[in-house]
Amino acid sequence: MNAIATTNSDLHWNVLTIKRSGLVRDLPAGKEELMWVANSSTLICGERDAILVDTLLTTEQSQTLLDWVVASGKNLAAIDVTHGHGDHFFGLASLLERFPRARAVATPEVVKAMHEQLSPGWLENFWRRLFLDEIPDRLLVAAKQK
C-alpha cells in the first residue's frame, strides 16, 4: 500500500495505491515482476465530506480501502466509478454499508459496462476464475449520473 496527498487549497486529495496480481499469469521465466499491476483510489476531501474516485478489486483490498477512508475522518458523500472494469467497482458494497448516505455514481456508459462485468460470462468465467475466493460476495452497480 502506498499513499500520497496534497493540501494546497480548500480541497485536498489523497491517493491509495495497491499492488495486486495482474491478469496475465503465463509470463516467461524471469519476467515475474510483470505479473502484478497497481490499482488506485483517490479521496477528494473538503472540510467535512469526501468523494472517492474508484474502489478496489478484492475483499481484502476493499477492507484496506474502507479502513483508509474511515481513518480520514471525513463523511463519504459519493463514489465516482470511472469505468466499468471490476477492479474499479467491486469494492462498492462495503463502502456503502459503512456510509449509507453515500451515492455511487457513474456515466450511463460506465453503468452499462458494470452490468456486463457482472454477467456470468465475466464474473464467473473471468474475475472469479482468476481471483478465486478473493472477489467480494456482494457486488453493486453505481447509479447513472444525471
What is each of the regions a protein language model found here?
Residues 54-55, 84:
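Glycine- and other small-residue-rich loops at beta-strand/loop junctions that grip anionic moieties
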Residues 49-51, 78:
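Structural motif
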Residues 51-53, 104:
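Short hydrophobic-aromatic micro-motifs
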Residues 21, 87, 110-112:
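Surface-exposed, flexible loop/turn segments at secondary-structure boundaries
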Residues 4, 111-146:
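Metallo-beta-lactamase
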Residues 60-106:
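Active-site metal-binding motif and surrounding structural segment of the metallo-beta-lactamase
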Residues 55-57, 108:
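A mature extracytoplasmic/lumenal domain signature
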Residues 1-48, 57-60:
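Zn-dependent metallo-beta-lactamase
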